[in-house]
């Protein structure tokens, strides 16, 4: 089975992300969760914090590794000797953007395939953006994220 790269910002990782990683772990020998650093984005959590939270949320999965990256995804996939990019599709609205990304990645790295998974129904409405919003207003996010994420966001918002 090929190695798969699951890229994302993961600001923060949610149970929806973890569900996709768990399911991909049954399909592929090795999953590399690639936490993106994009200087054009202003994430709530820095790259190290995001990587650490992904590690904690996926610690129960023996075939998952976590690394940060800041270069072109097609180049990163090649550096990792992977042949598949995993992406999640929550709704039809995600499809057009993901389709464009897959086409561009195919142009840049023709040997790499993109695979799309949909989340479990009970997780399809969860997004990192919503989690940050709820947490910033003091809401309970524990149902939607790993306990380490709940703790990290509570701490982050109590500092501000």
From Swiss-Prot:
It holds the Pfam family CTP_transf_like. GO terms for cellular component: cytoplasm. Its cofactor is Mg(2+). This is Phosphopantetheine adenylyltransferase. Reversibly transfers an adenylyl group from ATP to 4'-phosphopantetheine, yielding dephospho-CoA (dPCoA) and pyrophosphate. Pathway: Cofactor biosynthesis; coenzyme A biosynthesis; CoA from (R)-pantothenate: step 4/5. Homohexamer. It is an enzyme of class 2 (transferase). GO terms for biological process: coenzyme A biosynthetic process. It catalyses: (R)-4'-phosphopantetheine + ATP + H(+) = 3'-dephospho-CoA + diphosphate. InterPro entries: Cyt_trans-like, PPAT, Rossmann-like_a/b/a_fold. Keywords: ATP-binding, Coenzyme A biosynthesis, Cytoplasm, Magnesium, Nucleotide-binding, Nucleotidyltransferase, Transferase. SUPFAM superfamilies: Nucleotidylyl transferase. The record marks 17 as: Transition state stabilizer. Substrate binds at residues 9, 41, 73, 87. ATP binds at residues 9-10, 17, 88-90, 98, 123-129. It comes from Marinobacter nauticus (strain ATCC 700491 / DSM 11845 / VT8). GO terms for molecular function: ATP binding; pantetheine-phosphate adenylyltransferase activity. It is found in: Cytoplasm.
């Amino acid at each position: 089975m090929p190695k798969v790269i699951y890229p994302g910002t993961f600001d923060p990782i949610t149970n929806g992300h973890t569900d996709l990683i768990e399911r991909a772990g049954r399909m592929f020998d090795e999953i590399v969760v690639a936490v993106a650093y994009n200087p054009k984005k202003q994430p709530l959590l820095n790259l190290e914090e995001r990587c650490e939270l992904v590690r904690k949320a996926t610690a129960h999965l023996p075939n998952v590794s976590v690394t940060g990256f800041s270069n072109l995804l097609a180049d990163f996939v090649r550096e990792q000797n992977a042949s598949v990019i995993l992406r999640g599709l929550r709704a039809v609205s995600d499809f057009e953007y993901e389709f464009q990304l897959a086409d561009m990645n195919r142009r840049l790295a023709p040997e790499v395939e993109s695979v799309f998974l949909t989340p479990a129904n009970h997780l399809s409405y969860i997004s990192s953006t919503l989690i940050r919003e709820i947490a910033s207003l003091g809401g309970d996010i524990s149902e939607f994220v790993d306990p380490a994420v709940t703790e990290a966001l509570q701490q982050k918002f109590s500092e501000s």
